[in-house]
Amino acid sequence: SFVNPRKVPQMADAEAVLQALGAPPSGVHFIGLVLNHRGFERAVAAGCNEIGMAVVASDSFNRRNQGGSTDESIAAWLDLAGKAEQAGIRAQVTVSTAFGCPFEGEITVERVVEVARRVAEARPFEIALADTIGAGVPTQVTEIVSRVREAVPGIPLRCHFHNTRNTGFANAFAALHAGVRTLDASLGGIGGCPFAPGATGNIATEDLLYQ
């Protein structure tokens, strides 16, 4: 994550991690999470061959997480996606709080679809739908994935779940049945957004593979 090291100090050594890994093997993508131009420049200089940006469906959360409105983040994404294309690297985007927000509560399906349509204007390699705080349930996953697939045909969807309420793996199963073919997970279920009160880790890679 190439985010502000003063706000997220545990990510301050992103360049050192990439340096230790060396060049990515053929077919492997080192993805750098960026939120602005500075992060993009750092990620490219460090050797990332794919960048990902987050745009939050909840304006309140976007302001706390990224210091600006959702509209501002969408504008930044469209610009950075163009720069990534010029640099010859892939770009993908995550629609965060797609299943609920700790500050605004429920996020309507219409809002998620609206944000997905707007970020799709840059023709990203992939759009992710993130349950940032682990609030989603399988029926909600089915509805949101189906609606977004209809709204942005031709763009692959990825889903990102947390297991806050022990629904993360059921949500992953629902996403697969709804047509998603890529899921985020982390070893041991580590992770969690520092700006999301009460957030727990991602679904665990080893448990997802077992499922």
Regions found by a protein language model. Give the residues of each.
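Short amphipathic alpha-helices and their capping/turn segments at secondary-structure boundaries
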Residues: 37-47, 76-86, 117, 172-175
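Glycine-rich, proline-tolerant flexible connector loops at the mouths of alpha/beta enzymes
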Residues: 1-20, 54-68, 97-103, 128-138, ...
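Catalytic alpha/beta core domains of metabolic enzymes, predominantly
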Residues: 132-211
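Distinct, well-ordered alpha-helical segments
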Residues: 10-11, 41-47, 103-112, 137-149, ...
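Alpha-helix-loop-beta-strand connector modules within alpha/beta enzyme cores
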Residues: 7-32, 71-92, 114-118, 139-159, ...
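Non-cysteine beta-strand/loop elements that form the S-adenosyl-L-methionine
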Residues: 49-58, 92-96, 179-187
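Conserved anion-binding
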Residues: 58-66, 70-132
